[in-house]
UniProtKB/Swiss-Prot annotation:
Gene Ontology CC annotations of this record: plasma membrane
Lineage of producing organism: Bacteria, Bacillati, Actinomycetota, Actinomycetes, Mycobacteriales
Gene: cobS
Keyword Transferase on entry: yes
Reactions catalysed, as given in the entry: alpha-ribazole + adenosylcob(III)inamide-GDP = adenosylcob(III)alamin + GMP + H(+); alpha-ribazole 5'-phosphate + adenosylcob(III)inamide-GDP = adenosylcob(III)alamin 5'-phosphate + GMP + H(+)
Coiled coil (residue ranges): none
Natural source organism: Corynebacterium glutamicum (strain ATCC 13032 / DSM 20300 / JCM 1318 / BCRC 11384 / CCUG 27702 / LMG 3730 / NBRC 12168 / NCIMB 10025 / NRRL B-2784 / 534)
Cofactor: Mg(2+)
Protein purpose: Joins adenosylcobinamide-GDP and alpha-ribazole to generate adenosylcobalamin (Ado-cobalamin). Also synthesizes adenosylcobalamin 5'-phosphate from adenosylcobinamide-GDP and alpha-ribazole 5'-phosphate.
Pathway given in the UniProt record: Cofactor biosynthesis; adenosylcobalamin biosynthesis; adenosylcobalamin from cob(II)yrinate a,c-diamide: step 7/7
Protein name: Adenosylcobinamide-GDP ribazoletransferase
EC numbers for this chain: 2.7.8.26
Presence of keyword DNA damage: no
């Protein structure tokens, strides 16, 4: 992730004229940088571009969520003819997420894990972070994070809260925004991290949390609990969680999960900053992937509690 983009030479007096509309430039460049979608991005890379991309990062998560819903509904008719195991669907969904972002965040998680697991001083840790080879720590952490997501999604696909799967990529990317808050610094003056770290304002995160919570409440109230992979509409039943009694509570659980993911990202970012003497793009990718894994597990807890 740290090598995805870097600063472009530019005339400071002409900088504003080389940028496009803030909203569209942020959204399109975020999709260009963070996915394999053939979307045109910005023509100039600087801190302004980086800030606009980070402000739009959760939108990329909503695009992932939209594609996830399409996959679920596309597999639905097939499951009506032949049995499609929930685990297989979960593997397909998680694999799709990774392919859509070119394994970028997973690569960042692996790099960060190798560097963090070395317990080396910041200069040496940064060298390990830049090493393209993956060690045991990186491989194990990446594997466990993916397995957590697959297991959690498998619990959700046949449940009455299947739609929560679509929010997992969103919450991961909101957690990624936390890593680039203004109180953080990049350890290198060049590269992707220098473009984006320290550009995010707290109110951006708060706004995305409100938008996500509102959409989650809408889904809990209006979307049928019938999973596209289930032939019978399973009613909400009494269980250990209030969500099993009041569907609207599910929206609150999504909001709580988002806050938990953000708190984790804040604490983890501080730890990484101390270990590396700053942050880079790999640190953002690691927080995105781990934030998504935490969100997936918390959603699965609700799904299992409602059985």
């Amino acid at each position: 992730m740290s090598g995805k983009a870097g600063f472009t030479p530019e005339d400071p007096e002409d900088s504003d004229n080389r940028h496009g509309n803030p909203l569209f430039e942020g959204i399109f460049t975020a999709l260009n940088w963070m996915t394999v979608l053939p979307v045109p991005g910005a023509s100039v890379f600087d801190r302004t571009t980086g800030a606009r991309v980070m402000a739009s990062l959760p939108f990329v998560g909503f695009v992932f969520g939209m594609f996830t819903a399409i996959i679920m509904w596309a597999i639905g008719p097939i499951s009506g003819v032949i049995h499609v195991d929930g685990l297989l669907v979960a593997v397909l969904i998680v694999a799709f997420w990774e392919l859509l972002n070119r394994f970028m965040h997973l690569d960042g998680l692996a790099d960060v894990s190798d560097a963090l697991g070395s317990y080396a001083a910041p200069p040496r840790a940064r060298e390990i972070l830049a090493d393209p080879r993956t060690g045991l720590f990186g491989l194990a952490t990446a594997m466990l994070s993916v397995l957590l997501q697959v297991a959690a999604v498998a619990s959700l696909v046949d449940s009455t809260v299947w739609w929560m799967i679509c929010f997992i990529p969103v919450l991961g990317r909101i957690a990624g925004q936390v890593t680039a808050l203004k109180n953080h610094n990049a350890f290198s003056p060049t590269g992707f991290g220098a473009l984006v770290i320290g550009t995010v304002k707290f109110w951006w995160i708060a706004l995305w949390l409100l938008v996500t919570a509102a959409l989650a409440f809408w889904c809990a109230e209006l979307i049928s609990p019938l999973s596209p992979l289930t032939s019978v509409n399973t009613p909400f039943v009494a269980g250990p969680f209030p969500a099993a009694i009041n569907p609207a509570w599910l929206g609150g659980w999504v909001a709580i999960t988002a806050v938990v993911a953000c708190v984790f990202a804040a604490l983890f970012s501080r730890r990484l900053s101390r270990s590396f003497g700053g942050l880079n793009g790999d640190c953002i990718g690691a927080c995105i992937h781990l934030g998504a894994s935490i969100s997936a597990v918390m959603f699965a807890v609700v799904a299992n509690a409602m059985v």
